[in-house]
Design a protein with these regions (language model features):
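Active-site helical microenvironments for divalent-metal-assisted chemistry
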Residues: 1-144
Length: 144
């Protein structure tokens, strides 16, 4: 990967720091997509020894990339997300992976596995994604 491609891709992902989610932090501010992703990854890492049968490297990759599309589309809460929103997010994901030709096939296969949720790793990643959101909602003040 050329340095300019690397930096350009990181610049797109930087949007995850700026794009906020529906949830709030315990300090009363909106959580960013990047903060959510960080904690989902931490959860997978911390639970690695509890689930030795899982390929945790694969789970961590899923956790790390699962919201990359939101760097382009922004976060749409699951209770508001439509089929059209999901299609736009998938288009954004494919546009992003196309910027990484050396990793495009690997990333698209990983996204397909995540969407199908048939493997133990994909099910575990999705459970962590949902669990993190529940934990965050419970940590936020009731007034938010």
């Amino acid at each position: 990967m050329k340095p300019a491609e690397f930096m350009g891709f990181l610049h797109i992902l930087e949007n995850m720091k700026c794009n906020t989610r529906h949830s709030w932090t315990h300090t009363g501010r909106h959580e960013s997509v990047a903060e959510h992703t960080f904690r989902v990854c931490c959860m997978a890492f911390l639970l690695e020894r509890e689930f030795p049968e899982l390929d945790m490297n694969r789970v961590l990759k899923m956790c790390l990339i699962h919201d990359w599309g939101e760097a382009v589309t922004g976060d749409i809460p699951s209770f508001l997300k439509t089929g059209g929103d999901e299609a736009r997010e998938l288009d954004a994901i494919h546009a992003l992976t196309a910027k990484l030709p050396d990793r495009e096939a690997e990333l698209n296969a990983l996204y397909a596995e995540m969407e199908a949720r048939e493997t133990p790793e994909a099910k575990f990643y999705k459970a962590l994604d949902r669990l993190e959101a529940v934990i965050q909602h419970n940590e936020a003040p009731m007034s938010t």
